[in-house]
């Protein structure tokens, strides 16, 4: 319910802007993926600002993104994330990141010298092309303005997922 990072607005709602008669369900699905990627870009920018672009370990900026979980099995998701963030995206062999982590902990607990790369190696990388990054950069300027407006709209009583009709005026 609502918008999570980087917005943190519990009552926020989503919407599709700019739809035309030529758009179909596939366009809506891609727009949803692009929206999630845009929030990932916003979170990445906030993390870089807070860290002074030193990275989480203080040794310098992060070099690309790593996808884990079931979403990492979809090449389109990696392509969109790479294009929207402008970062290379790497995936691991198994989408079961939690299981690989549990196996790593178990192996470590009994003294086996195993690393995450042994259990679940990197297998694929998606490097964004300059053309795609530029297209998403232009798209992002509009998307950011729309998102900043949408998260602050007040849809009134019932827009919290309760009995009312969300978004009715």
How should these model regions be labeled?
Residues 1-169:
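Glycine/Thr-rich phosphate-binding loops that ligate phosphate moieties of nucleotide
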């Amino acid at each position: 319910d609502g918008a999570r990072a980087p917005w943190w607005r519990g009552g926020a709602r989503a919407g599709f802007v700019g739809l035309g008669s030529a758009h179909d369900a596939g366009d809506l699905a891609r727009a949803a993926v692009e929206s999630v990627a845009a929030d990932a870009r916003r979170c990445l920018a906030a993390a870089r600002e807070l860290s002074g672009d030193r990275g989480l370990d203080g040794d310098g900026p992060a070099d690309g993104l790593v996808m884990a979980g079931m979403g990492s099995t979809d090449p389109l998701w990696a392509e969109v994330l790479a294009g929207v963030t402008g970062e290379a995206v790497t995936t691991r062999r198994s989408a079961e990141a939690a299981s690989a982590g549990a196996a790593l902990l178990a192996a470590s607990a009994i003294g086996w010298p195993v690393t995450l790369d042994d259990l679940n190696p990197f297998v694929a990388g998606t490097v964004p092309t300059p053309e795609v990054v530029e297209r998403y950069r232009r798209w992002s300027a509009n998307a950011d303005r729309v998102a900043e407006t949408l998260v602050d709209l007040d849809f009134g009583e019932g827009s919290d997922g309760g009995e009312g009709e969300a978004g009715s005026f």
